[in-house]
Amino acid sequence: MKIGIINTKIRTVFSAFACMIAASLVCTMPARAVVEININKGVIEPLPIAITDFLSADQLGSNITSVIAADLERSGLFAPIDKGAFIEKISNPDAAPRFEDWKVINAQALVTGRITKQPDGRLKAEFRLWDTFGGQQMIGQQFFTTPDNWRRVAHIIADAIYERLTGDKGYFDTRVVFVDESGPAQKRVKRLAIMDQDGANVRFISDGRALSLTPRFSPNWQEVTYMSFEGGSPKVYLLQLETGQRELVGNFPGMTIAPRFSPDGQKVVMSLLQDDGSANIYTMDLRNRTTTRLTSSQAIDTGASYSPDGSQIVFTSDRGGRPQLYVMGADGSNPRRISMGDGSYSTPVWSPRGDLIAFTKQSQGQFSIGVMKTDGSGERLLTSGFHNEGPTWAPNGRVLMFFRKAAGAGGPKLFTIDLTGRNERQIQTPNFASDPAWSPLLE
């Protein structure tokens, strides 16, 4: 069965940067991070960076530059300088710039580039990153792609700049799958949708005729698992994003809750509602469809998420009274409570870096998005309000996306926040949106 076919147009254009040719654009500066990211610092001073319009025969160069600048600015680590302050007009991006002109406006780094159309119709995108105070080129790269993938080129360039200046992998060349919500509150239509991480290129991947919830990416981002009430009972499906083909993962008696992939993509972990009203955590091996029960309690165990190495699982359980966070081995062994604060905890998700667990906390009439170390220590609440829920990690483990509903008759919206808790941004979507899940870096 096909639903919501997506033409990704990516595999034929990019494959792990295989189309990148950098032999003629060498890095001439020793590797070092210019921007220091310290999540305990509280306030990070953004790095002033000048991003010149890429030379091109049309508006495309300026469009690409705008996306690069928006990506970097939204991270909270960079402050793109207004183009009206530029002294030098770049006419040859291959030549060294007049560094003194850029130092005068306090540009710590400079980006120049060019877009040219090739005889075969493809685009060639080149860029260089300069250390203006050091007077040296830091990196230079070029890419080939089709014209309709220009936004993806911009995200890849922004990732390269981010990585070179921070020492961390970027997260801009990624996608987010979420639940699109439209219509009045009493008759809300919920469809699965996918978009670029900045809210562009929204595509619907379900038709809204059946309630669909909890979409989650596979580790290779080519598949999404989700729960659907098609036919009136909850079922878990696996959707191939490139073809639109889907298959039934399991048709279990009772409700199936919050399916999520293992890091190797070979299993799905989920909760199954039992006849006595309890819910326990199971895994299903996608290779042979065998299920294994991991918890056996009279409580509600749900919201399971693997550690990046696949050796542990964090989940929510009310076995001690209020919902709290627990960690156990991937085989269900040695469950132990890690959350010790007041209130209730839910929707835990392990950081891709392996160092933190994000969660939703309900306490004193507010819903907060927070993080803690994997042993439960160092709990920090990043944002609080009427209803914040459902954190998901960017693949570099530095930023979270979540959904928020304000008091009143409105609906949920998507936001991002970094680990300082100070850089919070709304992601614009066509309708109300909830339950986001961030993809790995695209390949």
Swiss-Prot record:
Keywords on record: Cell cycle, Cell division, Periplasm, Signal
UniProt subcellular location: Periplasm
InterPro entries reported in the protein's UniProt record: 6-blade_b-propeller_TolB-like, PD40, Tol-Pal_TolB, TolB_N
Family annotation (Pfam families): PD40, TolB_N
Signal peptide: 1-33
GO biological process terms, semicolon-separated: cell division; protein import
GO cellular component: periplasmic space
Keyword Signal: yes
Superkingdom classification of source: Bacteria
Subunit description: The Tol-Pal system is composed of five core proteins: the inner membrane proteins TolA, TolQ and TolR, the periplasmic protein TolB and the outer membrane protein Pal. They form a network linking the inner and outer membranes and the peptidoglycan layer.
Entry similarity comment: Belongs to the TolB family.
Function comment: Part of the Tol-Pal system, which plays a role in outer membrane invagination during cell division and is important for maintaining outer membrane integrity.
Name this polypeptide is given: Tol-Pal system protein TolB
Gene name tied to this protein: tolB
